[in-house]
Amino acid sequence: MLFNKYDVNAVEIHDPGMVKYINVKSALNLHTGGRFSSYYAGKINMNVVERLINKLMRSEKWTGKKYSAYKITEEAFQIIAEKTKQNPLQILINAIENAGPREEVTRLKYGGIAVPKSVDVSPSRRVDEALRNIATGATNASFKSKKSIVNCLADEIMAAARNDPTSFAISKKEEIERVAQSAR
């Protein structure tokens, strides 16, 4: 159970490449305290909701305030459950699958000239990019706005799950893929 309300066993991950990298195992406490940081690719052992909470703590206002980010996420999940009548964890998984870019650009040097080259994105980076863009979109939408961060996070997750281009995460993904397509 997540937040003692939502069933984690009912969640399905549709993207076969991301199954290994999205951890939805039940956790009593979404605070590992960096337990997996010393392991290679240890972040795949962390619950995806805790990773979202950690991404919310990136901006200046929320830096280091894990309990505040925890409450924001919990209240956003309540709003998602009320509006969609579905498991909010499933909505988050759908949002991550939709918001993760499939290809991006890297720079190669050929004889002193930097040339952009399109490359595939690893599944773990897709999850990281999706979570980062969802959290960034929510904090940007709530900055100097009457809407609270809770409502902005819920709206961002639901819009990304619908693959709505008004979502910051989806628009960022499309921008990255468009640039990569031009660099083929």
UniProtKB/Swiss-Prot annotation:
Entry keywords, A to Z: Ribonucleoprotein, Ribosomal protein, RNA-binding, rRNA-binding
Superkingdom in the source lineage: Archaea
Cellular component GO terms held in the UniProt record: small ribosomal subunit
Name of this protein: Small ribosomal subunit protein uS7
GO biological process, one term: translation
Family: Belongs to the universal ribosomal protein uS7 family.
Function: One of the primary rRNA binding proteins, it binds directly to 16S rRNA where it nucleates assembly of the head domain of the 30S subunit. Is located at the subunit interface close to the decoding center.
